[in-house]
């Protein structure tokens, strides 16, 4: 038989099998575009802006639909009601984490972000309790953030009002807070070890959000046989793991179980308490993975939000003026901002919320997975199915936010100028997998931004009306374009 005929028959069989699986096997998956054999729907997805592709598909197939990334189905929840129904109302059923091939190679399902089941529940519970209750012994986390805010201000003063790219400085501050929480001590901004650590994380974030890595996750065989930036990701993670391992060894040698100094000490003490438990999840491997997760989640996301936030404030000087007036009235010039100030600063609070809403940092959330067979509305979603929840569709909902594509702190203010909460505000996701570092990130954003605006006037290099705040969307996240500004001492 002609090889071409054989190939066509095989592809046809694969297509029929794919369609059969979509409509049988215990029920019916949500509707969606017809997948091609092997390729699935990847030709209908723009991997430079996945969120836009999902928006277009939702107009055709509704708020719950299925796309095939290669041969694997992914169910998409679009809009507030669908996202809430999945992540909150059916929180346990949708609390799994879809482990991509890249993540399988990097952390093997360890840690807290990409783990599942008993491991995830135990590590997450421990991490939350440690970060929440620790007050870190003698010093609260707020103390550490305030210290870093003062260091950030001093570092910005060293620019002497000259034009600068704020990317590094705004990345160093949240990274140092994590260092303080994890390792007890912060680093000098010019410390070579600190610079290397930040460099590895930043490079990995850039690569992991590239279209090439999205393709590698769909066709993992490419990683085994082709050169590419995925190799750099593995090398960088090895560097970070070795760094954490060295720090862990130092902690083991000086550990005082009655006086834990930081997160690593608390984890090591927990390991000692469970040393006779053969099924314990508290191992050196899980410690390294968890610390790496905390770094990854707590550094780049906050720094990107800060950098984008300053760009928006330069674009909208009328907003900046109102925030600075509120800072002057409530805090003044002679003390550092603290979290107690926030309740008396509704406009500033609304501005921080609006920055997060507008930039829509992680448009499609971190992928979830079903933990069991789920009947969702009139559909059947098998256990282990990947689930994407569109945060864009919630944060930019035009019923909740009157001008969703415009930057306007009024979205979070009532008619009297008081701060107004919104159930649609979920930049940290929602439900059982809500970002573990949400409280810390909110604290950092408020304290860092108020400290900067208390001490400096933001001076753009171009007219505010010419500033481009259009997000650069790449793979799984959005960020601001590179820019320079001057920090003029107030």
Swiss-Prot record:
It is found in: Endoplasmic reticulum membrane; Microsome membrane. Heme binds at residue 435. It comes from the Eukaryota. It catalyses: an organic molecule + reduced [NADPH--hemoprotein reductase] + O2 = an alcohol + oxidized [NADPH--hemoprotein reductase] + H2O + H(+). Induction: P450 can be induced to high levels in liver and other tissues by various foreign compounds, including drugs, pesticides, and carcinogens. CDD domains: CYP2C-like (cd20665). InterPro entries: Cyt_P450 (IPR001128), Cyt_P450_CS (IPR017972), Cyt_P450_E_grp-I (IPR002401), Cyt_P450_sf (IPR036396), Cytochrome_P450_fam2 (IPR050182). GO terms for biological process: organic acid metabolic process; xenobiotic metabolic process. PROSITE patterns: CYTOCHROME_P450. Its cofactor is heme. Keywords: Endoplasmic reticulum, Heme, Iron, Membrane, Metal-binding, Microsome, Monooxygenase, Oxidoreductase. This is Cytochrome P450 2C14. The lineage of its organism: Eukaryota, Metazoa, Chordata, Craniata, Vertebrata.
């Amino acid at each position: 038989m002609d090889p071409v005929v054989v190939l066509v028959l095989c592809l046809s069989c694969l297509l029929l099998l794919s369609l059969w699986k979509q409509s049988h096997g215990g029920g019916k998956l949500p509707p969606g575009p017809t997948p091609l054999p092997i390729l699935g729907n990847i030709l209908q997805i723009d991997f430079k802006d996945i969120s836009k592709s999902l928006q277009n598909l939702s107009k055709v197939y509704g708020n719950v639909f299925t796309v095939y990334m290669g041969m694997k189905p992914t169910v998409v929840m679009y809009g507030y009601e669908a996202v809430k129904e999945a992540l909150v109302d059916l929180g346990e059923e949708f609390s799994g984490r879809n482990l991509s091939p890249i993540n399988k190679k990097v952390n093997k399902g360890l840690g807290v972000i990409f783990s599942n089941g008993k491991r995830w529940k135990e590590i997450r519970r421990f991490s939350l309790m440690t970060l929440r209750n620790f007050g870190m012994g003698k010093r609260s986390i707020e103390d550490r953030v305030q210290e870093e805010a003062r260091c950030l201000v001093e570092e910005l003063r060293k620019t002497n009002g000259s034009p600068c790219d704020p990317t590094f400085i705004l990345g160093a501050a949240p990274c140092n807070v994590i260092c303080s929480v994890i390792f007890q001590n912060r680093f000098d901004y010019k410390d070579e070890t600190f610079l290397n650590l930040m460099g590895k994380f930043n490079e990995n974030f850039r690569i992991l959000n590239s279209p090439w890595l999205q393709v590698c996750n769909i066709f993992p065989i490419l990683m085994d046989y082709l050169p590419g930036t995925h190799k750099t990701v593995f090398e960088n993670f090895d560097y970070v793991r070795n760094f954490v391992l060295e720090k862990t060894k130092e902690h083991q040698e000086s550990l005082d179980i009655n006086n834990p100094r930081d997160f690593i000490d608390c984890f090591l003490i927990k390991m000692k308490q469970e040393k006779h438990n053969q099924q314990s999840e508290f191992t050196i491997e899980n410690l390294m993975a968890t610390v790496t997760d905390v770094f990854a989640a707590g550094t780049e996301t906050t720094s990107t939000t800060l950098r984008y936030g300053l760009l928006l404030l330069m674009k909208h000087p009328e907003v900046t003026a109102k925030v600075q007036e509120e800072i002057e009235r409530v805090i003044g010039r002679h003390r550092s901002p603290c979290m107690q100030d926030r309740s008396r600063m509704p406009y500033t609070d609304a501005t921080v919320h609006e920055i997060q809403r507008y930039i829509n940092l992680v448009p499609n959330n971190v992928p979830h997975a079903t933990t069991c067979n789920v009947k969702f509305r009139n559909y059947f979603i098998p256990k282990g199915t990947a689930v994407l929840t569109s945060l864009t569709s919630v944060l930019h909902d035009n019923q909740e936010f009157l001008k969703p594509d415009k930057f306007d702190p009024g979205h979070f203010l009532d008619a009297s100028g008081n701060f107004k909460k919104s159930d649609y505000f979920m930049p940290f996701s929602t439900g059982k997998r809500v970002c573990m570092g949400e409280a810390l990130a909110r604290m950092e954003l408020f304290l860092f931004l108020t400290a900067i605006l208390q001490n400096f006037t933001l001076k753009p290099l171009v007219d505010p009306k010419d500033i481009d705040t259009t997000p650069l969307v790449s793979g799984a996240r959005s960020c601001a374009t590179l820019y320079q500004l001057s920090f003029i001492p107030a």
